[in-house]
C-alpha cells in the first residue's frame, strides 16, 4: 500500500476554469506535515484560487484535493485561514474581541454562554500578540485596514490549527507591525504546517522549506525566491 505517513494534502491534476478563463492548469503538489510552503507569482496567476481549492472552498473543474492523517485519508483537517479579502461585513456590529473569539466556536461554553477560563486566557493572549487588545471593544467598522487584518489573523490562529493558510497576511498592515507579523508567522511554523502567499518574499522565503511560484501552472523551486518572478532562482 502507498504510504502517506508524512503527506497531509495531495493536490492532484487540478484545473480550475471560470468561464473561458483558465485560472489553474493541471496543478499537482503535495504538502507534508510541518512544511512551510511560501507561494508567490504574478497578480491573476491563480494563487488565491489554489488556496481556496486546497481548502475545499472551491470545486475544481478537473482533478481533486485529498487530505491525510497518517496513513489514513480523511474528510477534513483543522485549518486556520486568513483570506486575502475578508467576507466580513464591516457594517455588522461585532467587536474585535468577538471576532478573535469566533475562532474558538468549537469550544464549550458554560450555561451563561461564557468561555472557560483557559479559553478566555487564550483570547486575551491572542489579542495581545496581534496588538489589538487596546481596542478590543471597538466594532470592526471603525478599524483601519491593518487593524482589521491583524484581528482576522488572530481569529485564524487562535485555535492552534494543524494547518495555517495565509493569503497576503501583510496586506494593509502598517510598517510598524510588519516585523511583529513575521514573528507570529515564525512562531506558527514551529507547531503548525504553514501555507503562505505573499508578494514580499525577502523574509518569508528564509522561513520556508518549500517554495512555489504559481502562474496558472505550479513551479516548485529548489531554492528560495526572494522577489516576484515567474521563474525560480537558479
Per-segment meaning from a language model:
Residues 40-42:
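The feature captures the beta-strand-to-loop junction immediately N-terminal to the Walker
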Residues 116-135:
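Conserved ABC ATPase "signature" region
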Residues 63-79:
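Conserved ABC transporter NBD signature motif
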Residues 205-206, 213-234:
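Conserved beta-strand-loop-alpha-helix hinge in the C-terminal portion
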Residues 139-143, 147:
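Conserved ABC ATPase signature
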Residues 55:
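Helix-to-loop junction immediately C-terminal to a conserved catalytic motif
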Residues 164-168:
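Catalytic Walker B motif of ABC-type/P-loop ATPase nucleotide-binding domains
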Amino acid at each position: 500500500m502507498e504510504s502517506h505517513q508524512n503527506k497531509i494534502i495531495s493536490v492532484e491534476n487540478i484545473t480550475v476554469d471560470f468561464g473561458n478563463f483558465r485560472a489553474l492548469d493541471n496543478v499537482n503538489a503535495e504538502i507534508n506535515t510541518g512544511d512551510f510552503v511560501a507561494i508567490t507569482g504574478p497578480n491573476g496567476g491563480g494563487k488565491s484560487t489554489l488556496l481556496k481549492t486546497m481548502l475545499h472552498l472551491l470545486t475544481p473543474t478537473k482533478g481533486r484535493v485529498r487530505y491525510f492523517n497518517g496513513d489514513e485519508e480523511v474528510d477534513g483537517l483543522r485549518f486556520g485561514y486568513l483570506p486575502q479579502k475578508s467576507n466580513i461585513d464591516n457594517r455588522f456590529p461585532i467587536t474585535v474581541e468577538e471576532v478573535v473569539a469566533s475562532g474558538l466556536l468549537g469550544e464549550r461554553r458554560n450555561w451563561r454562554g461564557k468561555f472557560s477560563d483557559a479559553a478566555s486566557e487564550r483570547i486575551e493572549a491572542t489579542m495581545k500578540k496581534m496588538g489589538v487588545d487596546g481596542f478590543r471593544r471597538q466594532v470592526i467598522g471603525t478599524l483601519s485596514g491593518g487593524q482589521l487584518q491583524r484581528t482576522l489573523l488572530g481569529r485564524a490562529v487562535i485555535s492552534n490549527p494543524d494547518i495555517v493558510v495565509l493569503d497576503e497576511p501583510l496586506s494593509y498592515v502598517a510598517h510598524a507591525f510588519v516585523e511583529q507579523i513575521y514573528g507570529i508567522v515564525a512562531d506558527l511554523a514551529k507547531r503548525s504546517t504553514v501555507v503562505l502567499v505573499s508578494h514580499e518574499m525577502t523574509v518569508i522565503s528564509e522561513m520556508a522549506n518549500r517554495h512555489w511560484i504559481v502562474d496558472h501552472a505550479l513551479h516548485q523551486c529548489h531554492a528560495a525566491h526572494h522577489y516576484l518572478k515567474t521563474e525560480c532562482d537558479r
